[in-house]
Every structure is written in structure tokens, then in C-alpha cells.
């Protein structure tokens, strides 16, 4: 708790010296999100994005999306992820999270495209393979579903996603 207070003071001091600095605003937004102050974090991500010299606005849109998802606002989060992908089409955080949202909306073709793009970036992780498997399952594509199940079993046998597969808990 003491370190959290010191970190907060350091960020506030830095923002006092450079209130429009994109990196400071982004990092303070991340700090707020990680310390369960998600609604407060959005203001700092948006402040970072406002700076025309800030070089990674997609990163702040993605982070805003994640923090907004944590507050149970998928519609608002969706908007942030879409903006991130407009600026950086291969943003992994935006791809996987928007893929999850599209899956929950029943938009399987778009969810499939997003997760496939994500999997091309790093050959997939347990989360993305699990999402791909569930997309194919809902789409009735049993061969593709089995392929993702095999990859999950082979590459991530100890993962919570594989455990859910073994239990038949698909949602």
C-alpha cells in the first residue's frame, strides 16, 4: 500500500511537470487500471492520445478498452479496440479482446478473422486457441474445432483453457 501511494505521488509530480506528456499519461492510466481504479484511468489514456506527438495512441486505446471491459462495459470497450485497430491493425491486445467481444455477440466470421490474425502474430496462446476452438464449435466446423483442441492439448496441457475443454465447459 505504501509503494502504491509513492507511485501515485510520483505520477502526480511527473504530470505536474509535463501534464500533456503522452507516455506519462498512458503509464499513469495503466497504474490506475492495475490498482482497480479503471474509470479514473480512461481520462489519462485519452489525455495521452490528445498529444499529437504521442507515438503510440493505439496502445492507449487498447489499454482503455481492457480497463473498460473490467468495468463490465463491453460496448464502450469495443469502440476503443476498433479505434486501436484502425491505427495499428496488428495490435494483439485489441485483436484478441475484440475477437472475444465479437464471439459473445455471435459474430463468428469477424471473431474468426480477428483471432486468426492474432494467432499469426505469435502462433497463438492458450487463450486464443480456446477462443478459436469455441468459434469453430459454434459455427459447426468440427474439423477445425478438433484441430484447435489438439493444439491446445499438445501445447498448453496445464492451462485453465485446456481444463475447461476437458470438462466440456465451453462458455
Please identify what each model-predicted range represents.
Residues 27, 61-63, 97, 131:
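Canonical tetratricopeptide repeat
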Residues 120-171:
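Terminal, low-structured helical/coil segments at or just beyond the last alpha-helical repeat
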Residues 21, 55-57, 91, 125, ...:
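Residue-level recognition of tetratricopeptide repeat
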Residues 17-18, 51-53, 87, 120-122, ...:
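Structural marker of alpha-solenoid helical repeat scaffolds
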Residues 24, 58-60, 94, 128, ...:
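TPR alpha-solenoid repeat register
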Amino acid at each position: 500500500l505504501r509503494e502504491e501511494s509513492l507511485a501515485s505521488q510520483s505520477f502526480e509530480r511527473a504530470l505536474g511537470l509535463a501534464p500533456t506528456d503522452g507516455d506519462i499519461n498512458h503509464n499513469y492510466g495503466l497504474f490506475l487500471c492495475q490498482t482497480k481504479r479503471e474509470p479514473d484511468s480512461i481520462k489519462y489514456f485519452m489525455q495521452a492520445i490528445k498529444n499529437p506527438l504521442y507515438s503510440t495512441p493505439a496502445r492507449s486505446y487498447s489499454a482503455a478498452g481492457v480497463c473498460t471491459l473490467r468495468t463490465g462495459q463491453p460496448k464502450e470497450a469495443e469502440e476503443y479496440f476498433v479505434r486501436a485497430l484502425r491505427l495499428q491493425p496488428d495490435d494483439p491486445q485489441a485483436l484478441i479482446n475484440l475477437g472475444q467481444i465479437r464471439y459473445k455477440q455471435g459474430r463468428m466470421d469477424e471473431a474468426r478473422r480477428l483471432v486468426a490474425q492474432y494467432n499469426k502474430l505469435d502462433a497463438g496462446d492458450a487463450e486464443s486457441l480456446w477462443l478459436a476452438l469455441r468459434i469453430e464449435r459454434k459455427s459447426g466446423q468440427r474439423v477445425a474445432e478438433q484441430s484447435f483442441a489438439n493444439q491446445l492439448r499438445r501445447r498448453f496441457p496445464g492451462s485453465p483453457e485446456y481444463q475447461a475443454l476437458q470438462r466440456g465447459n465451453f462458455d
